[in-house]
Amino acid sequence: MKITEDIIYAGVNDHQVDLFEGQYRVPNGMAYNSYVILDEKTAVMDTVDANFADEWLANVAKALDGRKPDYLIVQHMEPDHSANIENFVKAYPEATVVANTKTFAMMKNFFPKMDLAGRKLEVKDGESLTLGKHVLTFVFAPMVHWPEVMVTYDSTDKVLFAADGFGKFGALDREEPWDDEARRYFIGIVGKYGPQVQKLLKVAGTLDIQKICSLHGPVLTENLGHYIEKYDIWSSYRPEEEGVVVAYTSVYGNTKKAAELLADKLKEKGCPKVVVYDLARDDMSAAVADAFRYSKLVLATLTYNAGIYPFMQDFINRLTERSFQNRTIGLIENGSWAPTAAKVMKGMFDKSKNITWTENNVKVMSAVKEENVKEIEALAEELCK
């Protein structure tokens, strides 16, 4: 697949993986992207996952069409992109590996027996590499989302090779809208590092970018402003749109009843969007992504071992470790003798910024009663304002 006249896609699709990074469900698989740039000198951009060594090397050879690669440019050392560096070096003993200081240090840890003597080109932030008419400029992007990450700008074809930036879940041979799986990918994997993404976006804003080539997901070629705007929203932790996420855990169905009753009341009152998640059964990463997508969140759980139910604890931890902020939160707690869930949940957000707590909350003692229905009505009224 040609990206431009001189840039050819050499990546692979993975339909073997069921959990990316051992935790994110990927029903449509994953893409591990790699690119070949043809010029007076040739460059390969990154490698792919270890399970696809032969397929990737064949793709690279096909793209090179009989030529030898001059450079392997390593932007990111996470194994889904770096696993085949040693295989490449063995296959092409005359090629030079291009990376930064931190990348080479990591490379030594991943491949302790690999000998790169005389085959290393160490680059600094802002330095360029000329292939011929193509000039590649390296922009360091530390903690987006590893410390060694850099992106590469081709000023000739105006292409940004964005490392994991602008990536998404899903293989390239499965068509699906970009936003949802890119949001889930960003919030889950990169979301903790919003300030670092903001810095990279500022640099990107100074470049004339016509295509974005990520290491995951499709090449972005049209309406780039849409994708950049989404990244700006996600990395600044602002709500994308108005709506309410109701996230609950329930043992015997009573807390579930309260959560579902609230959702029904919200819909009756014309709330623009209402999404309900059973945290024990639904995809946790989707629940987290939607909590960042919408402006308001309701947490409904029971007191459990003098704390809160484990799935709710996990959910809140995932939010707070990703700098959840700028949201309104309401609480529904349940308990049979000494409810503490609301206090515990609220305390977990002590370090979160710009959290507005609803005035109306719901306290259930074992089962939903008439007074709880009134509390739920009041909470729905407040959330729909």
Regions found by a protein language model. Give the residues of each.
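Active-site-proximal loop/helix segment associated with metal-binding centers of metalloenzymes
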Residues: 145, 149, 165-192, 235-240
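Conserved beta-strand hairpin/beta-sheet module of binuclear metal-dependent hydrolase folds
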Residues: 2-62, 151-154, 158-162, 255
